[in-house]
Amino acid sequence: SQNPYANAFTDVKDFVFFDTDWQDILWGTTASTSHELSVAGGTDRNTYRLSARYMYDGSNLKWGNNNNQRYNLRLSNTFHVTDAFEIESVIAYSRQDQVAPTQIGAALTSSVQQPGFPSSTIDGKPYAWGTWGAPNWYCELGGDNKLKVSGVNISETFKYKFNKHFDAVAT
């Protein structure tokens, strides 16, 4: 558009005021889901429970890749070796995959944008004026931080019942 102030801001080619709602531009709705499946069974001397879980947590941030996924697998066993001696075994595995925009800090901790500052050019490309950049594009084009964490936990418990008032437990 043409500059409405002919003798001022002569270096600014796009001098219009937009009704820019940064909350609406940056944030939206998302979905989270969690699924679990377990199987249990056994006999008088041996019981088990196997469970698996998947969780996906999306992000309200509309720009860039931002989500969290978690996988869990767990096996619990109880072996009654004798009437007085019991072994409990728990083996658990978990994995977390998290993705966040590399420049999310620059986008979310930036000062409030200038009044009328557009989020993009008229043809949908990133917009910047001097050192002011549209924060949505920092998230969209700044790359991804990927965090992958896996863990295994093994727990064994040995119980011996001497009498109805006294047990010995070792883990």
Give residue ranges: language-model regions.
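Surface-exposed cleft-lining segments at the edges of enzyme active sites
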Residues: 22-24
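Residue-level marker of alpha-helix boundaries and capping positions
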Residues: 26-27, 64
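Transmembrane beta-strand segments of Gram-negative outer membrane beta-barrel proteins
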Residues: 19-20, 43-52
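Surface-exposed loop/interface segments of Gram-negative outer-membrane beta-barrel transport/assembly proteins
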Residues: 1-18, 55, 59-153, 167-171
